[in-house]
Structures are given as structure tokens and as C-alpha cells.
Amino acid sequence: MVEDALATEAILEAETILEASDIPLQERLQNLMQYLHDRLPHFHWVGIYWLKGNELVLGPYVGPPTEHMRIPVGRGVCGTAVAENMNQIIEDVRELENYLACNLETRSEIVVLIRCPKSGRILGQIDVDGTEVGAFDESDEAMLEVIAERIARLVV
């Protein structure tokens, strides 16, 4: 859950980071993941997965290492978001049969799709893990949707 003032601050800082055109795009995305991780205490792990064919490929991230460098569409929370064409907010990952454990400390997860601004086609997603049950809600989703839209403008 993120307060309005902090969400606004995060969106403005995300825009500043992403608009630094003198810095390579991948570095800007890594800097953005670092900022979100550091500024939002409930973001234990935050990263981007890019959709390549029928699998998600890990891009820039900050947090504990993960063995999930590639995730098939339909597997876990990330793959389900693509298969169902919708964002996911999972209050307690331990209740999911289809959960791919990236970290034993993870209790909640949010996935927000990154879509092509013109076609709506899925390009990737922002994936965030939290260590508390119920760490994320619609306020996190709304903030991440704005950030995802800003990312999409840079990669299409």
C-alpha cells in the first residue's frame, strides 16, 4: 500500500529517471528498479520481465537473486498475468497452487503489465514481491500502471 503523496513522488522520479536520454535505456530501467526498491519499503524485490514469444525473460531487477530467469506464459503469478491479460495482486502467495517461489521470504506479489500504448499488446511486466501478507493493493497497482505506461513509451 502506497500513500498518494509517495505515489506521486515515485511517478515524478520515475519520469526523471526514464527521461535521462544521455543514459542507455537498460541502465535507466535498472536505476528505476533501484529507486523503487529503495524508496518503497514494502518492495522487497522489484523487476521487469519482457515477453518474448511464449515466455517471460527477466530484465533489470533489484532484490535477492532469483533462479526464474525465464517463466513460461501461464506459470506462476507472472505467467498468469500474461495468460489472463490482466494485472495480478496476490495477498498471500502461499495460497496459490501455481506459485513459483523466487524467495522464501515472499508473502505477497503484484504484477502490472507493460502494454504498447497504441495496440495494448503486452510487452512485459513490472513484478514486485513483498515480505508481508497483503503488502499490495490498488494504490500500488495505480502507481505501477503509470510507471509501466512511461516504460512502454520508451521501448516501442
Question: Where are the regions that the model predicts?
Answer:
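Regulatory sensory and allosteric helical modules in signal-transduction proteins
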Residues: 51-102
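Short hydrophobic/aromatic beta-strand element in the GNAT-like acyltransferase core
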Residues: 45, 111, 125
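Short loop/turn motifs at secondary-structure junctions and domain boundaries
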Residues: 40, 101-107
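Intrinsically disordered, low-complexity terminal regulatory regions
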Residues: 1-66
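Sensory beta-strand/linker motifs that couple input domains to effectors
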Residues: 120-130
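Short coil/turn motifs at secondary-structure junctions
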Residues: 53, 117, 131-133
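Juxtadomain coupling helices with adjacent low-complexity linkers
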Residues: 7, 15-18, 130-156
